[in-house]
Each structure stands twice: as structure tokens, then as C-alpha cells.
């Protein structure tokens, strides 16, 4: 008799995806982040669902409803901080996952990569809208500044901004629709993640060597399930430590001041995970130019497969490209730091240099270096 997991119509799908899936035997811990992202999404949906039961999307009561959750609801403080810091863990895993894809050449699986970029944009949009919901000073002014960027679009810009706001400023209509979208989008993210996996399982996973591993595959369970559980335990330990010991470490003090349209905070800045893009936006003096640079800082990932000039898929055996990759990581950390600094000398100059370097590495230096490596290896 056939095992039920191989014959049952529903269990068969799960079996082919998570149990009997043939997987390269050489996957390192860099391949853990996909499953960690899945766990992050589940944690965010569950904590978000319970928070939504107590939240009111009205400008007069939103701030007080969040305070009420923290003070009066059983373990409400835990839910709130798990949700806020869970977003930080989500983005840490997300950036590691994208970095892994860049380093090991996983972008050559273009369908999977493009769905991944769409996922990245959707997660960023969801996080931005969630940041607005507590209706604090930074929420309100962050929403005003970022949505206002759309007014840089020629001809339709101003109308588009007012359409998104639902009025002539960020107000009740804006908050209500942001709450609606913030609740809806995670389920769309879950659906997209399934499509992401569907395309991945069409080609099979990449591996650290970048060499086809069809002759050396092992079942996903028990080998990689155990490995993923270890990664999960490490992530949950870090998240628990963050939530229980220092829940406001990654936040901003202005998030404890109710929104006041008449008083602008001294430094308007987004959460830490958007600071690199914010620094690129600020480094260009022109509004439209800044908006284009902001969008391109993420959309540039879509052209990476077309710029792959190396004869090897992975960077494992390419030391020159490795140096450039780690320079890119350092550059992104620099941009993140600059994004949180005031707009004054020398931060403006450092931000402009780092922004130019970011685009130069991805668009110019990496393809050229790959060609040089091909010649050095006489390929």
C-alpha cells in the first residue's frame, strides 16, 4: 500500500514541497532564510490579527487604542512588541536572503527572482503602512513625507497624492485605508510566497558551488528540516531577547508622542530597514530625481540577471567579485547610518558618495570584474 503522504491529493503537494523534495547536499546556512521568512510571516499575521482586534483606525482613538493594548490587554505589550520587532527580524532575514541570491547567483532563475522582487516591494509597502497605524508624530509625518513624493510625478502627481490621502492632507481617510491595506497585504504576500516556491521547485535549488547538483541530491526531510529548526531557534532567541529586554531599541522616541499636524519633528526618518533607500532619496537635490533613485535602488535587482557576464554562476570561486560584494554590503551599512543622520555637512557628501558607489558597483563594476575574471581564467 502506498504511503498516504504520497497518495492523498493534498498531502501529496506538501510531500513534494517539504518532505521528499530532492535538495542539493551542500546547502549552507545561507539557505535557511527562506524558511525563516515563512515563520516571520506567520508570526506577523498572527500577532497582527490579535492586535487588530483591539485597534481602532480613527485619528482620535488610534494612539490611545495602541496604548490600551499595551496597558490593559493580557500580554498586549508582548503582542505589540513581537509585531514591531518581528518586522525588524523579517527585514533582516529578507536582506540576508537577497544578499545570498546575489552572492551565489540565484538570480539566474529569473522567474523566482522576479517574484522575489515583487515580494520585496509588497513587504516594504506593508511595513510602511503598518508604521503609520499607531498615529504618532513619526507615523504622521513619515506618511506625509513619503506619500508626498508621488507629487513629483509629472502632470498627475498632485491628483495622485490627494487620491491616496482621500483628502487634502493625511487624515482619517488615509489612516482607515492604510489599515485596510495593511491587513490585506500579508495574505497576498503569503500567496506570492507560494508562487515563489512553485517557480523554485520547477528548477530546483541552487547550491554554494554554482555547479548543477542533479547527481547529488538528498531528501529535504529530515536533513534540512532539522537544519531549518536550528536556524528558527536562533532567530526566535534573538527576537525574544529583543522583545523582552530592549523592545524599543530599534524604534524612535517620537513614536511615543501622539500625532500633531501643527508640529514637525526635528528629524523625520523611517524605520531602520528603510534608511538605506531614504539616504539615496535624500542624496539627490531634485525631487523627481530623488524619487526615481529611491525606486531604482530596489528595482535595480531586476536588471542583475541581464548584467551577469561571468562564466560561473556563483561567486564562490571568484575572489575579485567577492571583494566587490562585501564592498556593497559595507556601502549599504554606510547608507543606513547616513539615513538616520541630520541633513548637514559632512553627512550629505558621504550619502552622495555612498549612493553613487551603490549604483556603480551593481551596474558597472560587477559586470566588468566578471569579464576580467573570465579572462584571468582564460574562459
From Swiss-Prot:
GO biological process, one term: mitochondrial electron transport, ubiquinol to cytochrome c
Presence of keyword Transmembrane: yes
Subunit structure: The cytochrome bc1 complex contains 11 subunits: 3 respiratory subunits (MT-CYB, CYC1 and UQCRFS1), 2 core proteins (UQCRC1 and UQCRC2) and 6 low-molecular weight proteins (UQCRH/QCR6, UQCRB/QCR7, UQCRQ/QCR8, UQCR10/QCR9, UQCR11/QCR10 and a cleavage product of UQCRFS1). This cytochrome bc1 complex then forms a dimer.
Major subcellular location class: mitochondrion
Domain of life: Eukaryota
Pfam families per UniProt: Cytochrom_B_C, Cytochrome_B
Subcellular location: Mitochondrion inner membrane
Remarks, miscellaneous: Heme 1 (or BL or b562) is low-potential and absorbs at about 562 nm, and heme 2 (or BH or b566) is high-potential and absorbs at about 566 nm.
Binding site for a ubiquinone: 201
Family: Belongs to the cytochrome b family.
Gene responsible for this protein: MT-CYB
Residues at which heme b b562 binds: 83, 182
Function: Component of the ubiquinol-cytochrome c reductase complex (complex III or cytochrome b-c1 complex) that is part of the mitochondrial respiratory chain. The b-c1 complex mediates electron transfer from ubiquinol to cytochrome c. Contributes to the generation of a proton gradient across the mitochondrial membrane that is then used for ATP synthesis.
Cofactor remark from the record: Binds 2 heme b groups non-covalently.
Keyword Transport: yes
Species: Lampronycteris brachyotis (Orange-throated big-eared bat)
Protein name, UniProt field: Cytochrome b
Molecular function terms, GO-annotated: metal ion binding; ubiquinol-cytochrome-c reductase activity
Residues annotated for heme b b566 binding in this entry: 97, 196
Annotated PROSITE patterns: CYTB_CTER (PS51003), CYTB_NTER (PS51002)
Amino acid at each position: 500500500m502506498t504511503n498516504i503522504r504520497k497518495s492523498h491529493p493534498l498531502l501529496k503537494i506538501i510531500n513534494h514541497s517539504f518532505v521528499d523534495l530532492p535538495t542539493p547536499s551542500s546547502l549552507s546556512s545561507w539557505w535557511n532564510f527562506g524558511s525563516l521568512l515563512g515563520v516571520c510571516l506567520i508570526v506577523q499575521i498572527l500577532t497582527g490579527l490579535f492586535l487588530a482586534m483591539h485597534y481602532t483606525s480613527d485619528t482620535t482613538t488610534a494612539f490611545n487604542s495602541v496604548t490600551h493594548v499595551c496597558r490593559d490587554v493580557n500580554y498586549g505589550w508582548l503582542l505589540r512588541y513581537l509585531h514591531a520587532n518581528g518586522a525588524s527580524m523579517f527585514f533582516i532575514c529578507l536582506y540576508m536572503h537577497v544578499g545570498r541570491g546575489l552572492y551565489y547567483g540565484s538570480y539566474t532563475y529569473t522567474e523566482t527572482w522576479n517574484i522575489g522582487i515583487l515580494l520585496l516591494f509588497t513587504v516594504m509597502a506593508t511595513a510602511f503602512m503598518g508604521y503609520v497605524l499607531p498615529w504618532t508624530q513619526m507615523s504622521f509625518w513619515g506618511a506625509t513625507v513619503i506619500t508626498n513624493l508621488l507629487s513629483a510625478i509629472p502632470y498627475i502627481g498632485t491628483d495622485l497624492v490627494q487620491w491616496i490621502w482621500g483628502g487634502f492632507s493625511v487624515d482619517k481617510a488615509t489612516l482607515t485605508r492604510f489599515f485596510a491595506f495593511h491587513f490585506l497585504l500579508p495574505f497576498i504576500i503569503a500567496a506570492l510566497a507560494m508562487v515563489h516556491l512553485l517557480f523554485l521547485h520547477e528548477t530546483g535549488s541552487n547550491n554554494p558551488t554554482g555547479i548543477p547538483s542533479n547527481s547529488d541530491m538528498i531528501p529535504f526531510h529530515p536533513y534540512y528540516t532539522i537544519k531549518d529548526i536550528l536556524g528558527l531557534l536562533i532567530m526566535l532567541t534573538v527576537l525574544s531577547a529583543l522583545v523582552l529586554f530592549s523592545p524599543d531599541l530599534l524604534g524612535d522616541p517620537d513614536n511615543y508622542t501622539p500625532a500633531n499636524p501643527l508640529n514637525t519633528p526635528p528629524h523625520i526618518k523611517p524605520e531602520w530597514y528603510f534608511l538605506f533607500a531614504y539616504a539615496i532619496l535624500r542624496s539627490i537635490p531634485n525631487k523627481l530625481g530623488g524619487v526615481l533613485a529611491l525606486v531604482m535602488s530596489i528595482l535595480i535587482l531586476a536588471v542583475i540577471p541581464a548584467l551577469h557576464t561571468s562564466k560561473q554562476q556563483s561567486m564562490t570561486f571568484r575572489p575579485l567579485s567577492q571583494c566587490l560584494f562585501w564592498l556593497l554590503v559595507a556601502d549599504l551599512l554606510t547608507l543606513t547610518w547616513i539615513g538616520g543622520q541630520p541633513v548637514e555637512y559632512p553627512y550629505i557628501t558621504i550619502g552622495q558618495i555612498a549612493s553613487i558607489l551603490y549604483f556603480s558597483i551593481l551596474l558597472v563594476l560587477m559586470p566588468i570584474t566578471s569579464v576580467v575574471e573570465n579572462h584571468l581564467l582564460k574562459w
